[in-house]
Amino acid sequence: LKAYYFQSSRGLPKATTLYNDFSAQHLWDKNAFIQSQYKKEFSRQWVFRTSAKWNWSYQHYLDPAIKNNEGKTENSYYQQEYYLSASVLYRLLNNLSFSLSTDGSINTMNANMADFAHPTRYSWLTAIAGKYVNEWFTLSVSALATVINEQADKGGSAGNHRKLTPYVSATFKPFRNEEFRVRFFYKDIFRLP
């Protein structure tokens, strides 16, 4: 079990305009998380691993010199994440293994602004992979299934996404006594903002 807490308070620089470099902007950050991991080797062939994490972050921004109706800009943001992960590894032979992993997370974000969307994102990622290794050659293949469901209390959300992305990698060691390798790979990536 691991726990972490971080807190900071700092001024932010502003653009220098006509030799005026004064800035009253300020940013406060707080971040805390708790995580745990568990690993169990049932045999030389079977290995199970799981982890869990809770993360909380807070950010407060203040610019007292802004020219608006309130005479300042002041925003607070809160974010939480709940994350679970599990994987199983199966070694069929000494140089051939397969794995199945899955990650799930829930992310929420809130702010003190009147028209803030208050988004919530549910993410589920599952990968199946295989790996072959010998002294001259390594081959890795995998497929990642990504399922994202997003909702917002106000306005539009980024929507729901489903994607299957492949990965293939081949590594060759052409010389026995030299640590020189040639690697080829193909990867299709999918990311959300």
Residue ranges, per PLM feature:
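Flexible loop and strand-edge segments within Gram-negative outer membrane beta-barrel domains
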Residues: 2-49, 54-80
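Structural signature of Gram-negative outer-membrane beta-barrels, strongest in the C-terminal barrel
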Residues: 3-4, 93-193
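Generic structural signal for short, flexible, solvent-exposed coil/loop and linker residues
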Residues: 17, 21-23, 31, 35-37, ...
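Residues embedded in well-ordered secondary-structure elements
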Residues: 25-27, 39-41, 75-77, 89, ...
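Membrane-embedded beta-strand positions in outer-membrane beta-barrel channels/transporters
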Residues: 31-37, 51-53, 81-89, 123-129, ...
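Outer membrane beta-barrel translocator domains of Type V secretion systems
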Residues: 76-102
